[in-house]
Amino acid sequence: MVLIVALLVFFCFLTAVPAALDPKLTGTWATKSRKVVTGPAFYDPAEDRFQEPENTGISYSFTEDGYFEEAYFRAIPNPTKPSCASAMMQFQHGKYSVESNGSLVLTPFAVDGRQLISSPCKSEGSMYFRFNQTEVFKRYEVLTDPFHNVKRLNLYQFDGTPMNPMFLVFDPPQMLPTETLNPTAQASATGRSKAKRGLPYGSGMASSRNKRPSTQVGGLTDPDKWWWAGVMMTLVGGVAFLYSESPWKDW
């Protein structure tokens, strides 16, 4: 009995241990162009829209108390038609942890992630999604870059592939509030999988390329008017048929 109680206490202690954090990660990091930086200049949660930077790039921010934010702006080449390259913008934020094996795990707030894919040569123009994907980096390094003499962050994807190095641009970090920004009753899927759902874009970039004709109500396309017209035509046809078959039609 004593052994069981001891095991229960030990288990409770393990579950109460907070996730490991690394103060060396604190700050805002950006790739060499420094044109893509986390914060309100990249994604505006009030208007629910992206603001297109001058150049492509990646940015990550981390806080001392375990929160992260990411900003992606990438070009997607089209090998068969180079003039029809696409672009992708992506925002996520949430909590991070450093695992015992040295991996870095980013767990986003499921309802807040956004992704915009612009395809100028496709009829739909742009697609705007709610986006949720947990990210796992096999390892990371924080060091002083020998050439630029500034702090550099090296991230290695889950399979060990290195990402473009990022450099410290802000400390303390430049971020949006570390809380759910767009609460909704129906959260998108969680876990280490990607969940996309279409949603209206609002008033931001590429909205004019994704407009669809509105449906008229009250004109010829009103289904109620077509229904009543059908009823009247049926009645008229029925009366004409009865009259043609009646014995007094020749009187």
UniProtKB/Swiss-Prot annotation:
Coiled-coil stretches are none
Show the GO MF annotations: unfolded protein binding
Q: What is its main location?
A: endoplasmic reticulum
What family classification does the UniProt entry report for this protein?
Belongs to the ROT1 family.
Please list where the region (Disordered) is annotated.
Answer: 184-218
Mind telling me which Pfam families this protein's record contains? Rot1
The gene name on file is ROT1
Q: Which residues are glycosylated?
A: N101, N132
Question: What biological processes does GO assign it?
Answer: 'de novo' protein folding
Query: What is this entry's stated membrane topology?
Result: Single-pass type I membrane protein
Which cell locations does it reside in? Endoplasmic reticulum membrane
Q: Which GO terms describe its cellular component?
A: endoplasmic reticulum membrane
Q: Which UniProt keywords apply?
A: Endoplasmic reticulum, Glycoprotein, Membrane, Signal, Transmembrane, Transmembrane helix
Report the domain of life of the source organism. Eukaryota
Residue ranges, Cytoplasmic side = 247-251
UniProt source species = Coccidioides immitis (strain RS)
Give the Lumenal compartment stretches of this protein: 20-225
InterPro entries named among the record's database cross-references = Rot1
Q: Residue span of the signal peptide, if any? A: 1-19
Polar residues bias: start-end ranges? 205-218
Q: What is this protein called?
A: Protein ROT1
Biological role: Required for normal levels of the cell wall 1,6-beta-glucan. Involved in a protein folding machinery chaperoning proteins acting in various physiological processes including cell wall synthesis and lysis of autophagic bodies.
The membrane-spanning stretches of this chain are 226-246
